[in-house]
Design a protein with these regions (language model features):
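Structural detector for short beta-strands of small beta-barrel domains
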Residues: 1-11
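A generic structural motif
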Residues: 10, 22, 64-67
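Residue-level signature of catalytic and energy-coupling elements of molecular machines
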Residues: 4, 44, 60
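Short aromatic-glycine-enriched beta-strand elements
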Residues: 13-18
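Beta-strand/loop nucleic-acid-binding surfaces
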Residues: 25-37
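Short nucleic-acid-contacting surface segments enriched for D/E, G, S/T with interspersed K/R
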Residues: 34-48
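OB-fold/S1-family single-stranded nucleic acid-binding modules
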Residues: 52-68
Length: 68
């Protein structure tokens, strides 16, 4: 699974963006977060995710925090 860093979070709107190792930003919805509470996520945290395509661009599914 690809890894990246949470680049932007809009907690009140229920979504954010992950920047992957190549610098591409992937949209993610709060419903894609696994094993963590969306409201407790913070920008700069490292995650792994499933890369998905959508009509609006790169999207992240199955978002999980990385330990350490």
């Amino acid at each position: 699974m690809p890894t990246g860093t949470i680049a932007r979070l809009l907690i009140d709107k229920g979504f954010g963006f992950i920047r992957d190792e190549g610098g591409i930003e992937h949209f993610f919805h709060r419903s894609a977060v696994r094993g963590a509470v969306f409201e407790l996520l913070r920008e700069g945290q490292r995650v792994e995710f499933a890369s998905e395509e959508s009509t609006k661009g790169p999207r992240a599914g199955d978002v999980r925090l990385l330990e350490g």
